[in-house]
UniProtKB/Swiss-Prot annotation:
Residues 27-646 are extracellular. Gene3D superfamilies: Phosphorylase Kinase, domain 1, Ribonuclease Inhibitor, Transferase(Phosphotransferase) domain 1. ATP binds at residues 732-740, 755. One of its GO terms (cellular component) is membrane. This is Probably inactive leucine-rich repeat receptor-like protein kinase At3g28040. It is a single-pass type I membrane protein. The chain crosses the membrane at residues 647-667. It comes from Arabidopsis thaliana. LRR repeats lie at residues 102-124, 125-147, 149-171, 174-196, 198-219, 224-245, 248-270, 272-295, 296-318, 320-342, 344-366, 368-390, 391-413, 416-438, 440-462, 464-486, 488-510, 512-535, 536-559, 560-582. GO terms for molecular function: ATP binding; protein kinase activity.
């Protein structure tokens, strides 16, 4: 109401003052002067000025030339410039601005103006218009194109939407600077843009423009262009020849689009180029050789494309390079020695290619290098010593085949290095003690190597270290007592080594520690109480050691602890009180001597064998008289004790032999019955098959509800040699229950998916296996992968299902190739709703009720229309009785972030709500594009916690996946995020059912989603 009243007042004031100005008698100058005063007063009337910057503006003055932020022409006393940048003003740009008929410069940037800009269309003398970084909206009016004097137009960082009219550039012959970046503009770039013939800077980045921008007939004709930025749109097509016409071009930024094809060969004929960024597109082919002519180029980024061929030997000719990024392509070959000519190079990133050979020592000549990233290639040989003489800040050689030892380094490197990652190589020798001299080191990762040495105690001197990762590096000796001298350490991982001794008390000094993993070593002694000082600790992994004693009860006071694993040690006693310990999964404490709940009355039961006690005095000499025992002498005593032991052994042996005979007899009978069942089952399953006594080891392919001929060549070949079709070429995926292949076993040779099940926990009885598969095959729903049959032998269990050729959600969301466009919001919503419907069917319609237990992106397959299909449902039914307690089966608990809290507690009843939790995590992944748990250099982020905090702070929109480029409806995204947080509630009863979730999602997609979400 207040806004409407203010608008009405300003409109009335505008009309009144306009009429007054027209009635004023006097000379012309007086009338013109009053127009400027009155226009600014009307303009001010629609503004909120919290800091009173415009206090000097008053209608009592005859001229505004003395007002703050106003400039006048000294000859005419007309307002020519109004600059209100960064004054925290809010409001709208009203028609009062139209009174400033001589205005040349209007700059209102970095405020919070809202509404449209239609009032600016009649300022015919305007030369500079800067409205950047406000909250203006609506379409950009084509009438701006009628301002022929306009030279500078900056609308960056607003909320303008819609398409650009061709008329906008009909009269732009004076325009030199144009920036419309960071808006919501869409459609094609107008073909009339070429009429801006003197344009030297064009920035249309971070919008939703699509199609091909008509380079030949449009942009390539802007011959005075010096800066071109079309990045972060959805532009596509190839880049044609003709860029050489932009002789003055200095900056070319086309990154984060969908351009494809080869790079234009004449790009190297723009001699003044100093910045080229073509990253994150679909460019292919080899790098044009003309690039070597770009002597002035200092920033060159073609990362995340499909470029191939050998690494260019002419790279050394581009002597001006400061930043070079060829990462995530398919480049091959060796690094040429000419790379040493890049004496100005500071940042080199060649990661994730197929480069091979040794790291050239000639790179040592690039004395200005600060960042070198060569990870994920096939480099071999030693690390050149000279690298450790440079002033590098970051060195990442991980994921190669490097051998030899780590160079010791120099004083220059000691003072500069911040991040060192040599993980996943084959390095040997000792970790040099000089590592403690890297005074600014924050991240050190030497994991997955073959050092076979001690952890250097000098690590304690790394006072700024936040991440120390020495996993699986064949380390020996003890954990250094002062390893936690650094108060900054947040992640400490020493698991998978051969460390001995006790866990030092000093580890409790790591006050910032969030992850501590010492698992799979040979550590002994008790768990130190000092661990209770680690108030920031979230993950504690001590499994597979030889730790003894009780778990300190003080650990129950750690409020941030989320995950604990102390399995396979020698621990006894009660678990500490505290939420995380009360909900521990059995697998997290198994393999100890005796751990029990603190709520249990009486002592904990120890899991140790009872000793055999033999009392030598319990067997007498007949009359059991002490005198007779004494007269027998010591020889008689020992002989009688020996005889007593012999009698026990003989009796025990007889019992064992007798029991063995009975067991073998029973087993033979059981085997005969099972073989008879198998023969009968196979004969009944396959009509027309002969009773030939086919070997059970050969197996049979059972296709349920199929018309495929049993005599088809593919089926017969598969039965004779199933492993022949299950090879690397046909492999399409891998999960916790086995590897998935595709094989032409369906009707007319159609491909089916074949999961080779991990044998150990799977039902070993054909009768049971057949029954459970037939139950699962009855589950029919558009959002479920249908089960087609199975193949069974005692040694090989295969589950045959529908083949979905479009891959899984993991590959589309987290492992997307540069050639694959990101998932749109509409597709993501379709996946969310379809997955919900599939789970609702399993929970509420299908009988028996089926819990998935393992919902995650790898188990969501997508068909050719991106419809989701849930796979791996019901696999818990195929577990043996021993493994059938699914809630305690760590096969279903692959990663922190997916597992519902109740799955970690052996005493809680688990129901369908654990799937609801996993579904909530899946929603968060789809909306944010992030993984459930993300590890950074200094810490890790749990996605559900992060989104919940951002929602409480009112910044939840910052969580949304940026690759969607804001092409989504907030009215859908926000309720979906809130629904996800409700689904991931720690208390199962607070989560909705999947049937309710389907209804909520369907309502969210309607015009009034708040009706449902207001109840959350």
């Amino acid at each position: 109401m207040g806004k409407q009243r203010r608008t009405m007042i300003s409109f009335t004031l505008f009309l009144t003052l306009t009429m007054m100005s027209s009635l004023i008698n006097g000379d012309t100058d007086s009338i013109q002067l009053n127009d400027d005063v009155l226009g600014l007063i009307v303009f001010k009337s629609d503004l909120n000025d919290p800091f009173s910057h415009l206090e000097s503006w008053t209608e009592d003055d005859n001229t505004p030339c003395s007002w703050s932020y106003v400039k006048c022409n000294p000859k005419t006393s007309r307002v020519i410039e109004l600059s209100l940048d960064g004054l925290a003003l809010t409001g709208k740009i009203n028609r009062g601005i139209q009174k400033l008929q001589r205005l040349k410069v209007l700059s209102l940037s970095n405020n919070n103006f809202t509404g449209n800009i239609n009032a600016l269309s009649n300022n015919n003398h305007l030369q500079k218009l800067d409205l950047s970084h406000n909250n203006l909206s609506g379409q950009i009016p084509s009438s701006l194109g009628s301002i022929t004097s306009l030279q500078h137009l900056d609308l960056t960082g607003n909320s303008f939407s819609g398409t650009l009219s061709d008329d906008l550039f009909n009269n732009c012959s004076s325009l030199r600077y144009l920036s419309l970046s960071h808006n919501h503009l869409e459609g094609q770039i107008p073909s009339t843009l070429f009429r801006c013939s003197v344009l030297n800077s064009l920035n249309l980045s971070r919008n939703r423009f699509s199609g091909n921008p008509s380079f030949v007939s449009g942009i390539w004709r802007l011959e005075r262009l010096r800066a071109l930025d079309l990045s972060s749109n959805s532009l596509s097509g190839s880049i044609p020849l003709g860029i050489l016409s932009l002789h003055n071009l200095k900056e070319l930024q086309l990154q984060r689009n969908q351009f494809s094809g080869a790079l234009p060969s004449d790009i190297g004929l723009c001699p003044h180029l100093n910045r080229v960024d073509l990253s994150s597109n679909h460019f292919s082919g080899e790098l044009p050789r003309t690039l070597q002519k770009l002597k002035s180029l200092n920033h060159f980024d073609v990362s995340n494309n499909l470029l191939s061929g050998d690494f260019p030997p002419w790279i050394g000719d581009m002597t001006g390079l400061v930043h070079l990024d060829f990462s995530s392509n398919e480049l091959t070959g060796k690094l040429p020695s000419s790379i040493s000519n890049l004496r100005s190079l500071k940042d080199l990133n060649l990661s994730e290619n197929k480069l091979s050979g040794e790291v050239p020592e000639s790179l040592e000549s690039c004395k200005e290098l600060m960042i070198v990233q060569l990870k994920g290639n096939d480099f071999s040989g030693n690390i050149p010593d000279g690298f450790f003489d440079l002033g590098l800040q970051e060195m990442d050689f991980s994921g190669n085949g490097l051998t030899g030892s780590i160079p010791r380094g120099s004083s220059r490197l000691f003072e500069s290095l911040i991040r060192l990652d040599l993980s996943h190589n084959s390095l040997t020798g000792s970790i040099p003690g000089e590592v403690g001299l890297f005074i600014h080191m924050r991240y050190l990762n030497l994991s997955w190597n073959h050092f076979n040495t001690r952890v250097p105690p000098e690590i304690e001197f790394l006072q700024n270290l936040t991440v120390l990762d020495l996993r699986n590096s064949a380390l020996i000796g003890s954990v250094p007592a002062d390893i936690c001298e650094s108060q900054s350490l947040q992640i400490l991982q020493l698991d998978g080594n051969s460390l001995t001794g006790s866990i030092p008390e000093g580890i409790g000094n790591c006050s910032s520690l969030k992850l501590l993993s010492l698992s799979h070593n040979n550590l002994t002694g008790p768990i130190p109480k000092s661990l209770s000082n680690l108030q920031e600790l979230k993950i504690l992994k001590l499994e597979a050691n030889k730790l003894s004693g009780e778990i300190p009860k003080e650990l129950g006071d750690l409020q941030n602890l989320l995950l604990v694993n102390v399995s396979f040690n020698r621990l006894i006693g009660r678990l500490p009180l505290g939420d995380v310990f009360q909900s521990l999964d059995q697998s997290a404490i198994q393999g100890n001597l005796g751990i029990c709940s603190p709520l249990l009355r009486g002592p904990c039961t120890l899991n140790v064998p009872k000793p055999l006690v033999i009392n030598p005095n319990s067997y007498g000499n007949g009359n059991n008289m002490p005198g007779n025992r004494a007269s027998g002498g010591s020889g008689t005593f020992h002989r009688r004790m020996f005889l007593s032991v012999s009698v026990i052994v003989a009796i025990s042996a007889a019992i064992l032999i007798f029991s063995g005979v009975i067991i073998i007899t029973l087993l033979n009978a059981s085997v005969r019955r099972r073989l008879a069942f198998v023969d009968n089952a196979l004969e009944s399953i396959f009509s027309g098959s002969s009773k030939s006594g086919r070997s059970l080891m050969m197996g049979k392919l059972v296709l349920l509800n199929s018309r495929t001929s049993r005599s088809s060549s593919s089926s017969q070949e598969f039965e004779r040699n199933p492993e022949s079709l299950l090879n690397k070429a046909s492999r399409i995926g891998e999960g916790v229950f086995g590897t998935v292949y595709k094989a032409p076993l369906g009707e007319q040779g159609r491909n089916l998916a074949v999961k080779k099940l991990v044998p150990s926990p799977i039902l070993q009885n054909l009768e049971d296996f057949d029954r459970e598969v037939r139950i699962l095959a009855k589950a029919k729903h558009p959002n479920l992968v249908s089960i087609k049959g199975y193949f069974w032998t005692p040694d090989l269990h295969l589950l045959v299902s529908e083949y979905i050729p479009n891959g899984n959600l993991q590959s589309k969301l987290h492992e997307r190739e540069p050639s694959t466009p990101p998932l749109s919001w509409d597709v993501r919503y379709k996946i969310i709703l379809g997955t919900a419907k599939g789970l609702a069917y399993l929970h509420h319609t299908f009988r028996p009720t089926t819990i998935h237990f393992n919902l995650k992106p790898t188990n969501i397959l997508l068909d050719e229309k991106n419809n989701p299909k849930i796979s791996d449902f019901g696999l818990s039914r195929l577990l043996t009785t021993q493994d059938g307690n699914t809630m305690n089966n760590n096969r279903f608990q692959n990663a922190l972030g997916y597992v519902a809290p109740e799955l970690e507690c052996q005493n809680l009843r688990v129901n369908e709500k654990c799937d609801v939790y996993g579904f909530g995590v899946l929603i968060l992944e789809l909306v944010t594009g992030r993984r459930p748990v993300e590890y950074g250099e200094d810490s890790f982020v749990i996605l559900s916690d992060h989104v919940r905090v951002m929602l409480e702070q009112g910044n939840v929109l910052e969580c949304i996946d940026p690759v969607m480029e804001e092409q989504y409806s907030e009215d859908e995204v926000l309720p979906v995020l809130k629904l996800a947080l409700v689904c991931t509630s720690q208390i199962p009863s607070n989560r909705p059912t999947m049937a309710e979730i389907v209804q909520i999602l369907q309502v969210i997609n309607s015009p009034v989603p708040h009706r449902i979400m207001d109840s959350f």
